């Protein structure tokens, strides 16, 4: 969802306008995939060109590189599993302002939870599968009036990172996807192509193909 459009309608999403809790720590929040240094995003939120027919389509989530069998994790405390499919699941988290945040995980190999289960941050929800060797992670904000918005997962994860003091970066082609959601003094410089390749080759995902995913 375009942040400017949301602000024009008086609906905001972010660490200042949509607080998770008064105080948080790493126990209260988690990224959807455990990584020691950074999440490797192969396809971010936004318009992208279809590799098959060349048409441009909106990609409403982000694709996170995974090894087959990597655990996928709940991101917050007190989530409720509201949907489970063969290779997907959705967890819903309430907000103090009456809105709800839904996090959806797709391309799973196994699902460990059932509908109506309550989950806490860091709980294992399932395992990534063989479909493109990536986790498709999307975020939807449901306002108290019932209107719904697809939110850039980078904005949501930036919020999670700040509230939970999570230090891992979220990178796409060497670019810090959190940069536009940080204050200038906290923004990190993007990596040069050589530095990005060096970082990839030394990362946990170095044994996985580096091409983008559909």
Model-assigned labels for residue ranges:
Residues 53, 113, 164-165, 204:
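Amphipathic alpha-helical interaction segments
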Residues 18, 99, 151-154, 195:
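Generic alpha-helical secondary structure signal
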Residues 49, 66-68, 112, 155, ...:
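Solvent-exposed, flexible loop/coil residues
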Residues 57-60, 68, 74-115, 132-141:
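Zn2+-dependent peptidoglycan hydrolase active-site motif and core
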Residues 63, 90-92, 117-182, 190-191:
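Conserved, short, structured surface segments that act as functional micro-motifs
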């Amino acid at each position: 969802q375009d942040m400017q459009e949301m602000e024009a309608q008086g609906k905001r999403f972010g660490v200042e306008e949509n607080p998770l809790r008064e105080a948080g720590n790493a126990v209260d929040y988690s990224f959807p995939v455990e990584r020691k240094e950074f999440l490797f995003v192969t396809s971010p939120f936004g318009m992208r060109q279809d590799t098959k027919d060349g048409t441009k389509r909106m990609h409403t989530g982000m694709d996170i590189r995974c090894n087959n069998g990597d655990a996928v994790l709940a991101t917050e405390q007190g989530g409720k599993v509201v949907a489970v499919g063969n290779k997907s699941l959705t967890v819903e988290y309430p907000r103090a302002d009456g809105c709800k945040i839904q996090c959806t995980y797709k391309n799973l190999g196994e699902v460990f939870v059932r509908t109506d289960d309550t989950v806490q941050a860091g709980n294992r929800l399932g395992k990534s599968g063989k479909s493109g060797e990536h986790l498709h992670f999307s975020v939807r904000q449901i306002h108290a009036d019932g209107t719904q918005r697809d939110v850039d997962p980078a904005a949501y994860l930036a919020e999670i990172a700040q509230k939970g003091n999570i230090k891992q970066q979220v990178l796409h082609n060497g670019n810090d996807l959190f940069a536009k959601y940080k204050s200038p003094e906290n923004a990190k410089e993007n990596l040069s192509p050589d530095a990005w390749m060096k970082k990839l080759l030394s990362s946990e995902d170095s044994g996985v193909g580096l091409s983008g995913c559909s």
